[in-house]
């Protein structure tokens, strides 16, 4: 018999879905007492090499308020050629093309193994992909040269029919005309004045590309539509390569003590307007490269005086950041415009100081774009990360989807509260929309402009079935996820995932519900909720909310005697959850101390879009130990794991750190690894490096690589992440294990757990 752990794993691999609860409480009242809501982490484009797309369109329920897709949960009458919708119970006739179906000849969408299935839409034109480069020229020559080389490299990776455009900016904004032979021609705009899409259309003489009337059947291959500013790669490859090579640093002089005048806000506005006027609702990426903060015009984040530092968290808390609100408002308006027309905005920011990601974060967050942060464009971190944007699948197609929409349909007993992730609401009200909103709610449809195989949304549900209307024994609730998107091949595709879970009466079957708890998924779903709240609430308030939820969960599902904390026990399905919450409280997602606003925005951006595995690594980093006593092994993320004769490899998602213990570091300095008789030591030093390289080669964005040792300045990255079970206060305690004491006043996991148990038991007594 399959265990819940295996069931959860199989569902994630097949459907890209992880639920907080895999048996659902059958009434609204009982569901609210579960503390953690019924919710799911859903990866719309989960990679399935064994799932070839089907070359026909889905069969829909005929009821206009439903329109659910035929799926394995539907009841089928093969004789009468009828099927009953499992969401609204409407009986539907199969289309004539299904005349030959029978119990022995079922279409793929009725087979249980195809609970997720992808259809190819054969009608409508196939549009080319569009890439619009928006390049900051206010940077050092070395950085600009490296960026130019990376962009030239990317041109060679684009399909020949892809349309490309180029906008450069500094004090002025230049829109380059790429259709000119022999000369470089561009339109120059002032960087201090914003332009509406209509004004831009008139100034550039733009017109929308007409979309041909939708027709059924295979499309006749036509040359891709284009204009002077967006041209096919195959036509202007050489010209654009030369143009990029000739790009110079912004010519306007920068007086001493001043920052260069950088018009990022206007440049992005023109990019959004250009695509808005020419290719609305077509897959397009605006790829913006910035080397510093916007210092003039709409969207500016700091003045040009170098003596005035860019805002910090302290300034924002004291309401002393004069440009934040206005700058954020400008970029939010641009993000919403881009999301409406289905265009993606990527931001690649490389500088030693902040560049304004706090104000600009809504652009990638709302459009499903990438956010990359680094020190310089001339580092392997940026170069390899940018190259991975253009990763291709086994069929030679980019691993990216464009202009996606997600629609969710539910059984009558459950409704949708909202979604948290890289999406915007399409304001589609329906019978399955809950009045209680969580995240982006009040809708059953969302726009996801940019999708990758790991893009993951958190979807929150509300059980609405009343306590006095019991669900029959064996009843199941169903949810259908319908994702429509433009594939990188130009095809429109529809991926449909339909899942079902059992209902249970929480008064008589609480053990069944408890056994179905997915603590990993629940931790990520609650973390997303906490980070979403942290954007608008005070940090301490969010931590208090998180603590209250944890205490309530422990009281509901823990086993203990009144007023006896030592008796507290958690079943195996809940045992790791408090540990996840402990590390989440200490994480840079909720603790802004020692991080700039840009860094916090960057960390939160990635957490809100990554899948479960990567999100767990972000909350609780993985620690591996290498020593002579045995093969590499995972060890506790604890200060007791830091030993003199060990090498540690820590993966935090954003950093890959190799730490050499005191003895190992001394041997390395003495050069033992270079002596033939100490070859085993050389192998020991090399083992974590090889494992680190494996992670570095596969992750997006590429993590920062840190090689440090006992007493090294960068060892602080490890010391700040481990549980401080040994500190300067207890390092000489009797029976204390050996390890590295951490100089901190933070509480350890043990103290945290002791306090949690005590609080649960005492509060229980007070309630009794």
Curated annotation (Swiss-Prot):
Membrane topology of this protein: Peripheral membrane protein
Q: Which GO terms describe its biological process?
A: COPII-coated vesicle cargo loading; intracellular protein transport
State whether keyword Cytoplasm applies. Answer: yes
Q: What are the protein's UniProt keywords?
A: Acetylation, Cytoplasm, Cytoplasmic vesicle, Endoplasmic reticulum, ER-Golgi transport, Membrane, Metal-binding, Phosphoprotein, Protein transport, Transport, Zinc
Q: Which residues of the sequence carry a binding annotation for Zn(2+)?
A: 61, 66, 85, 88
**Sample GO molecular function, one term:** GTPase activator activity
Q: Which Gene3D superfamilies match?
A: beta-sandwich domain of Sec23/24, Sec23/Sec24 helical domain, Severin, von Willebrand factor, type A domain, Zn-finger domain of Sec23/24
Keyword Nuclease in record: no
Q: According to the UniProt record, list the residues that bear Phosphothreonine.
A: 308
What top-level branch of life does the organism fall under?
Eukaryota
Entry-annotated residues carrying N-acetylthreonine: 2
* Gelsolin-like repeat residue intervals: 632-718
> Pfam family of this protein, just one?
Sec23_BS
Task: Please provide, in alphabetical order, the Gene Ontology terms of the cellular component aspect for this entry.
Answer: COPII vesicle coat; cytosol; endoplasmic reticulum exit site; endoplasmic reticulum membrane
Its annotated compartments are: Cytoplasmic vesicle, COPII-coated vesicle membrane; Endoplasmic reticulum membrane; Cytoplasm, Cytosol
| Function recorded in the entry | Component of the coat protein complex II (COPII) which promotes the formation of transport vesicles from the endoplasmic reticulum (ER). The coat has two main functions, the physical deformation of the endoplasmic reticulum membrane into vesicles and the selection of cargo molecules for their transport to the Golgi complex. Required for the translocation of insulin-induced glucose transporter SLC2A4/GLUT4 to the cell membrane.
Q: What's in the domain note? A: The Gelsolin-like repeat mediates interaction with proteins containing PPP motifs that include MIA2, MIA3 but also SEC31A. These interactions are probably competitive.
Q: What quaternary arrangement does the UniProt entry report?
A: COPII is composed of at least five proteins: the Sec23/24 complex, the Sec13/31 complex and Sar1. Interacts with SEC23IP. Interacts with HTR4. Interacts with SEC16A. Interacts with SLC6A4. Interacts (as part of the Sec23/24 complex) with SEC22B; recruits SEC22B into COPII-coated vesicles and allows the transport of this cargo from the endoplasmic reticulum to the Golgi. Interacts (via Gelsolin-like repeat) with MIA2 and MIA3; specifically involved in the transport of large cargos like the collagen COL7A1. Interacts with DDHD1. Interacts with TMEM39A.
The UniProt family comment states:
Belongs to the SEC23/SEC24 family. SEC23 subfamily.
Protein name (Swiss-Prot/TrEMBL):
Protein transport protein Sec23A
Naturally occurring in which organism (per UniProt): Bos taurus
The lineage, from the top, is:
Eukaryota, Metazoa, Chordata, Craniata, Vertebrata
């Amino acid at each position: 018999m399959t265990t819940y752990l295996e069931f959860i794993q199989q569902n994630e691999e097949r459907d890209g879905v992880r639920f907080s609860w895999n048996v659902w409480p059958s009434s609204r009242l009982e569901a609210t007492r579960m503390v953690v809501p019924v919710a799911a982490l859903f990866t719309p484009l989960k990679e399935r090499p064994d799932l070839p797309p089907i070359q026909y369109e889905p069969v829909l329920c005929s009821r206009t308020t439903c329109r659910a897709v035929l799926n394995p949960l539907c009841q089928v009458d093969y004789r009468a050629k009828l099927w009953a919708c499992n969401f609204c119970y409407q009986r539907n006739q199969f289309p004539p093309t299904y005349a030959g179906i029978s119990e022995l000849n079922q279409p793929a969408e009725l087979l249980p193994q195809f609970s997720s299935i992808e259809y190819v839409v054969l009608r409508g034109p196939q549009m080319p992909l569009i890439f619009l480069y928006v390049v900051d020229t206010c940077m050092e020559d070395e950085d600009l040269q490296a960026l130019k080389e990376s962009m030239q490299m990317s041109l060679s990776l684009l399909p020949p029919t892809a349309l490309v455009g180029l906008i450069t900016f500094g004090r002025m904004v230049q829109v380059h005309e790429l259709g000119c032979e022999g000369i470089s021609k561009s339109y120059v705009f002032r960087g201090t004045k914003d332009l509406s899409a209509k004004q831009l259309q008139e100034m550039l003489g733009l017109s929308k590309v007409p979309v041909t009337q939708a027709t059924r059947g295979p499309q006749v291959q036509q040359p891709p539509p284009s204009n002077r500013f967006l041209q096919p790669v195959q036509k202007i490859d050489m010209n654009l390569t030369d143009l990029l090579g000739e790009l110079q640093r912004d010519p306007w002089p920068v007086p001493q003590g001043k920052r260069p005048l950088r018009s990022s806000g206007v440049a992005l506005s023109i990019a959004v307007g250009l695509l808005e006027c020419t290719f609305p609702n077509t897959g397009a990426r605006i790829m913006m490269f910035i080397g510093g903060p916007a210092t003039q015009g709409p969207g500016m984040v700091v003045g040009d005086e170098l003596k005035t530092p860019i805002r910090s968290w302290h300034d924002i808390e004291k309401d002393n950041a004069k440009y934040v609100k206005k700058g954020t408002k400008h970029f939010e308006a641009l993000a919403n415009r881009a999301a409406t027309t289905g265009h993606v905005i990527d931001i690649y920011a490389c500088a030693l100081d902040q560049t304004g990601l706090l104000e600009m974060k809504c652009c990638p967050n709302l459009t499903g774009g990438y956010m990359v942060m680094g020190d310089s464009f001339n580092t392997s971190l940026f170069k390899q990360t940018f190259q991975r944007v253009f990763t291709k699948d086994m069929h030679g197609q980019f691993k990216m989807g464009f202009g996606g929409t997600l629609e969710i349909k539910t059984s009558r007993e459950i409704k949708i509260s909202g979604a948290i992730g890289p999406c915007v609401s399409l304001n589609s009200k329906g019978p399955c929309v809950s009045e209680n909103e969580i995240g982006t709610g009040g809708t059953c449809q969302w726009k996801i402009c940019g999708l990758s195989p790991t893009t993951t949304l958190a979807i929150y549900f509300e059980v609405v079935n009343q306590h006095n209307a019991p669900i029959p024994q064996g009843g199941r609730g169903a949810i259908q996820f319908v994702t429509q998107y433009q594939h990188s091949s130009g095809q429109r595709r529809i991926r449909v995932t339909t899942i079902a879970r059992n209902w249970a009466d929480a008064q008589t079957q609480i053990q069944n519900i408890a056994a179905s708890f997915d603590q990993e998924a629940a931790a990520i779903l609650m973390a997303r909720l906490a980070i979403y709240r942290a954007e608008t609430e005070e940090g301490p308030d969010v931590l208090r909310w998180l603590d209250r939820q944890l205490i309530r969960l422990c009281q509901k599902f823990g086993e203990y005697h009144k007023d006896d904390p030592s008796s507290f026990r958690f079943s195996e399905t809940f045992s790791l959850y408090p540990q996840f919450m402990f590390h989440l409280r200490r994480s840079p997602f909720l603790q802004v101390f020692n991080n700039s606003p840009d860094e916090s925005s960057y960390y939160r951006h990635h957490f809100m879009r990554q899948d479960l595995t990567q999100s767990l690594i972000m909350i609780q980093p993985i620690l591996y130990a290498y020593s002579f006593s045995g093969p590499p092994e995972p060890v506790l993320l604890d200060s007791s794991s830091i030993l003199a004769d060990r090498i540690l490899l820590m993966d935090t998602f954003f950093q890959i750190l190799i730490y050499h213990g005191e003895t190992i570091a001394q041997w390395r300095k003495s050069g033992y690894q270079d002596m033939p008789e100490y070859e085993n030591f050389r192998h020991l030093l090399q083992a974590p490096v090889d494992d680190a390289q494996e992670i570095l080669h596969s992750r997006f964005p590429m993590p920062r690589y840190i090689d440090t040792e006992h007493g090294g300045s960068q060892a602080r990255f490890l010391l700040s992440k481990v549980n401080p079970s040994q500190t300067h206060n207890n390092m000489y305690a009797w029976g204390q294990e050996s390890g590295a004491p951490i100089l901190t006043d933070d509480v350890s996991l043990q103290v945290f757990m002791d306090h949690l148990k005590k609080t649960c038991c005492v509060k229980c007594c007070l309630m009794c």
